[in-house]
Design a protein with these regions (language model features):
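Catalytic core of DAGKc-family lipid kinases
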Residues: 9, 19, 40, 78-83, ...
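Short aromatic-hydrophobic micro-motifs that form the base-stacking/packing surface
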Residues: 62, 85
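N-terminal glycine-rich "phosphate-gripper" loop used for MgATP/nucleotide binding
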Residues: 63-67
């Protein structure tokens, strides 16, 4: 691929965004490429900008934001010949980390320029949840409920939520789910259906980050392979402190006798008789009675 026209999509309310850094990035990119810059105004705007970029013949869309905006760009560009690249400006930057991109956005820009000038790009496989692509993770149950709780507290952007609030919300949900009957049923590939309280499907390890520490929910996951699935069959009240420590304190893999783990799956089906929350790449996908998760192989051009 040859990269000449670039669109830089900027989320000005992303957690680590700064105007000074943006100015440096713009200057660096415009020295080698025909650059256009657009700021997002609201949720969903990044997707609209990327769709228009495809129609306009832009070669590469660069997103300077966090994982939520990355997800919008991913969904707009998958299946097209327009490539994407990501520069870190979010709270966790899971996608950027998984690609081995530096967390310093200026350093990451230098890497991007070098690869784009050498026409280096690769095809990335994506997870698909009911027709919605995801780059890093998808969840049904506890983690989706946590994301919904944050969306309710911070409807404009999660950039302003603090780590204490996140941990408090997660703890509240763990305690609330403890002792509950498993009301989900999960079937992984051709396996038998299993009862579940919460299902987490990861494409990366770590699954997410907290205070810079990786939360290793899907420790064998890789962007080069399929779907890794962790399912919690039961959450005993006496197990809540141990699991909370595994999640927030130890950076070790979440494990236990009531936890099922499958590596490199191709299909996950989650069903329930009552609606359950779903999240993709940290944003709520609403309530579902049935969720089918699969893998779309090599559908997105990526420079990174």
């Amino acid at each position: 691929m040859r990269f000449q026209r670039l669109l830089l999509v900027v989320n000005p309310v992303a957690r680590t965004f700064s105007k000074g850094t943006l100015a440096v990035i713009e200057k660096a990119l415009s020295a080698d490429f025909r650059l256009e810059v657009a700021e997002t105004k609201e949720r969903g705007h990044a997707s609209e900008l990327a769709v228009q970029a495809v129609d306009d013949g832009v070669d590469l869309v660069v997103v300077f934001s966090g994982d939520g905006t990355v997800n919008e760009i991913v969904n707009a560009l998958a299946g097209t010949e327009t490539a994407m690249a990501a520069l870190p400006a979010g709270a966790t930057n899971i996608f950027v980390r998984a690609l081995g991109i530096p967390l310093d956005p200026v350093e990451a820009t230098g890497m991007l320029i070098a690869k784009a000038l050498d026409d280096e790009a690769f095809k990335l496989s994506l997870g698909v949840a009911d027709g919605h692509y995801f780059a890093v993770n998808c969840g049904a149950g506890v983690d989706a409920a946590a994301m919904r709780r944050l969306d309710e507290k911070f409807p404009t952007t999660k950039a302003r939520f603090d780590r204490v609030a996140f941990r408090a919300a997660a703890w509240e949900l763990l305690v609330g789910y403890a002792g509950r009957r498993a009301d989900l049923e999960v079937r992984i590939d051709d396996g038998e259906p299993l009862p579940s309280l919460s299902v987490m499907v990861g494409r990366t390890d770590p699954y997410t980050y907290y205070k810079g520490r990786g939360l290793r929910v899907t420790p064998d996951a890789s962007l080069d392979e399929g779907l890794d699935v962790l399912s919690v069959r039961k959450l005993r009240r006496r197990s809540v402190p141990r699991i909370a420590w595994q999640v927030f304190g130890s950076a070790r893999h979440v494990h236990g006798r009531d936890i099922d783990y499958v590596h490199d799956a191709s299909r996950v089906l989650v069903t329930s008789s009552t609606p359950f929350p779903v999240q993709v790449d940290g944003d709520s996908l609403g309530d579902h009675l049935r969720l089918e998760v699969g893998l779309a192989r090599e559908v997105l051009w990526v420079v990174g």
